[in-house]
Amino acid sequence: LMAADTWIDSYYLTSSGAWDPSVAYDNIYTWPCPGYTRVSSDYGPRPRPTAGASSYHRGIDISAPEGATVTSIHRGTVQSYGYNGTMGNYVKISHGNGVASVYMHMSRIANIHTGMSVSAGTTIGYVGSTGVATGAHLHLGILLNGNYVSPWNYISRP
């Protein structure tokens, strides 16, 4: 049995492992860390967890073990990726209509390139603790017209 409903490649599978063809694949946002649903730090004000971290968290942190799969939450185009001292290994995907998603602190980035088209559920990297991080997790940020907004406006916990 699967831990939660999730995307695998372009198929939506229920927690029982059954494919659900009724889910409109191109029109929904999906959970970025299949099988892991614990949010260790939510969007919004928070105490600084470590030096260099913000007291206003501009995303959500999903607890998962080092190496767990990170997937795109929606179809789009890889806008940028690489390493940043704060974000660690990161990928930024443009989804159109001013929406972009950013995935941070990954142990490594999957075989992607700038301009590459991705679908919801495409593997883009693997959970890690690079950059300013206190342990293995995925930080997911959502930008609307260049400003961070709550990821809960787009995704829901499976």
Residue ranges and their predicted role:
Residues 1-2, 93:
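SH3/SH3-like beta-barrel fold
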Residues 6, 84-86, 124-132:
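Short, charged beta-turn/beta-strand-edge "cap" motif at the junction between a beta-strand
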Residues 7-89, 120:
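Surface-exposed, glycine-biased beta-strand/turn segments
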Residues 12-14, 107-108, 143-158:
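Short peripheral tails and domain-boundary helices/loops at the edges of structured domains
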Residues 42, 81-82, 106-109, 127-130, ...:
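Residue-level recognition of beta-strand microenvironments
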Residues 55-58, 72-108, 136-144:
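Zn2+-dependent peptidoglycan hydrolase active-site motif and core
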Residues 64, 109-112:
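Short alpha-helix capping/helix-loop boundary micro-motifs
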Residues 76-79, 114-131:
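Active-site-proximal beta-strands of protease catalytic cores
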